[in-house]
């Protein structure tokens, strides 16, 4: 079995996740540019940018509970509608407090789409194909992020902030037709178990060791990934680059991501999870340290490419790790608990960048993110270990 066997899932599973990622990535580039350009400081820009991660963390447990009971399609449809409403709010009232609130809801909705798709896919795909299935999930996200980051700065330049926020919502809305058949025919789905399914508290207690294993590494890596998304635009602003140029610099790293995601899945399935993850996340840390000597657009581009190589080789790794450790009963609830811990990093990353950069500068922020990633790699290698062969090692 290979990537071709995943073709039936491209539209119903990967399509909605790709659509919501497109909208989210437009916002991640546009928000720091808009806020700093309007005279707000790094801290305000980082707080608003981090609100998306906060929304994802807050939504994680409710989304898992709902998915186990009502099914991935209904949850995915509701999440996409929330994303559309959030974009309308941001376009209507473009003040920092409303941008933060809208981004909070947008982040929660994107998390709902992701978890509902992952829960469905986890139950359908055998472990021997899981690395490639989840790397394709990461790869489709990277393709949408590449598109979003490439046009995010351009849209701010050409259309202005309000239209950019609306377009982010329209991008997410593309995924709605993919989940509607499942809403009309819940019997097509595998994941929903109804009201007799396990309680969230029971799932967490019974799987707390695996929850900490996957969640803490996910939090470390997400801190670095999300911090990078805020740091690179701020470095571009510090170099007096145009918003469109900043968008291209950020997108260049995602081009490398997109090329390498099939390699990530093949290595995870054929060699092992650690063989793909340790070198990949190590490159992400190295790329951040390269920013210390980058004082031109070319230097930032090269650093972004190194980070992109690492991020591409890690495509789908967090999805794979959590799916490897997920129990048969209460799969969506477990995945949502892991996601909640992981998404704390989505809040910490932008906040670290804003607070450290505001006090000690952007170089210090880059070092801080690199250290966070290295600590995560120590945890992964020394504590978590290889998960690809744990089909029978579940509590």
Where are these regions (language model features)?
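Residue-level signature of mid-helix packing/kink "hotspots" within the transmembrane helices
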Residues: 53-61, 145-146, 254-262, 346-347
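Cytoplasmic helix-loop-helix junction between adjacent transmembrane helices
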Residues: 104-141
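Paired small-residue
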Residues: 97-105, 298-306
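Structural signature of the two symmetry-related core transmembrane helices
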Residues: 74-88, 169, 275-289
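Helix-to-loop junctions at the C-terminal end of transmembrane segments
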Residues: 59-71, 260-272
């Amino acid at each position: 079995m290979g990537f071709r066997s995943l073709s039936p899932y491209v539209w119903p599973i990967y399509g909605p996740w790709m659509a919501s990622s497109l909208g989210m990535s437009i916002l991640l580039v546009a928000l720091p540019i808009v806020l700093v350009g309007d005279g707000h400081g790094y801290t305000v820009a980082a707080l608003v940018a981090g609100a998306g991660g906060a929304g994802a963390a807050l939504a994680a447990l409710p989304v898992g509970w709902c998915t186990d009971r009502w099914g991935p399609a209904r949850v995915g449809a509701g999440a996409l509608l929330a994303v559309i409403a959030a974009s309308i709010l941001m376009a209507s009232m473009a003040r920092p407090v409303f941008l933060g609130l809208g981004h909070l809801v947008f982040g929660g909705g994107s998390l709902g789409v992701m978890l509902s798709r992952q829960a469905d896919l986890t139950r359908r795909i055998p472990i021997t194909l899981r690395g490639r299935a989840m790397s394709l999930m990461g790869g489709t996200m990277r393709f949408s992020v590449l598109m979003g980051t490439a046009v995010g700065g351009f849209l701010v330049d050409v259309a202005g902030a309000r239209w950019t926020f609306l377009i982010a919502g329209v991008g997410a809305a593309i995924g709605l037709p993919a989940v509607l058949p499942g809403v009309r025919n819940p019997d097509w789905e595998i994941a929903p178990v109804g009201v007799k399914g396990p309680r969230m508290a029971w799932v967490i207690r019974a799987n707390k060791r695996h929850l900490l294993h996957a969640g803490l590494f996910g939090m470390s890596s997400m801190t670095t990934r999300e911090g990078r998304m805020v740091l690179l635009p701020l470095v571009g602003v510090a170099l007096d680059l145009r918003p469109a140029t900043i968008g291209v610099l950020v997108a260049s790293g995602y081009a490398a991501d997109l090329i390498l995601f099939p390699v990530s899945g093949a290595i995870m399935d054929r060699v092992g999870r650690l063989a793909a993850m340790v070198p990949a996340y190590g490159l992400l840390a190295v790329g951040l340290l390269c920013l210390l000597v980058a004082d031109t657009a070319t230097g930032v581009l090269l650093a972004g490419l190194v980070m992109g190589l690492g991020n591409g080789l890690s495509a789908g790794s967090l999805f794979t790790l959590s799916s490897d450790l997920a129990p048969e009963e209460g799969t969506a609830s477990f995945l949502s608990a892991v996601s909640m811990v992981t998404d704390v990093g989505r809040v910490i990353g932008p906040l670290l960048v804003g607070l450290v950069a505001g006090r000690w500068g952007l170089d210090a922020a880059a070092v801080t993110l690199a250290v966070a990633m290295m600590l995560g790699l120590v945890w992964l290698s020394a504590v978590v270990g290889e998960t690809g062969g744990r089909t029978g090692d579940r509590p």
